[in-house]
A protein has these predicted regions:
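Mg2+-dependent prenyl diphosphate-binding active-site environment of isoprenoid biosynthetic enzymes
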Residues: 20, 24-140
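N-terminal amphipathic/basic leader segments beginning at the initiator methionine
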Residues: 1-23
Length: 140
């Protein structure tokens, strides 16, 4: 395996670990169970990996960089939940989509909850700047 491949693998593992460690409450279960379900679905994590690589190139603080990468991945999951509803998809990453496992209203609420978590992750950046939030919201 090349050094670059090893780096990508390492970053992916760190992102997956950090996603699992997000402080997502257990109650109310009807809200947080679908959120946790959506986030454990996996995927390539391409967006946060690219974000991480660019941040490393600019010597971004590692903690801030991880939070930015997590926020990007959370934003992506938010859009996937809503996209699955719009496209009537029933499977995402080899598991039932959130709206198919629960219902459309729960899926919309879970997607919105993930977006809120992404905002909280961004706000936890030590050198948080309103420009970060502005850029993030323009992407959405």
């Amino acid at each position: 395996m090349s050094q670059f491949s090893e780096l990508i693998s390492f970053i992916r593992k760190e992102i997956n670990y950090s996603l699992k460690k997000l402080p997502i409450p257990d109650t109310p279960n009807y809200l947080y169970e679908p959120i946790k379900y959506a986030l454990k679905g996996g995927g390539k994590r391409l967006r946060p990996i690219l974000t991480h690589l660019v941040g490393r190139a600019y010597n971004t603080d590692p903690n801030s960089l991880m939070n930015i990468s997590l926020a990007i991945e959370l934003l992506h999951n938010f859009t996937l939940i809503h996209d699955d509803i719009m496209d009537s998809d029933t499977i995402r990453h080899s598991q039932k989509t959130v709206h198919h496992k629960w219902d459309t209203s729960t899926a919309i609420l879970a997607g919105d909850g993930i977006y809120t978590i992404a905002q909280l992750v961004l706000n936890s950046i030590d050198r948080y700047d309103k420009e970060i939030n502005k850029c993030f919201n323009e992407v959405t």
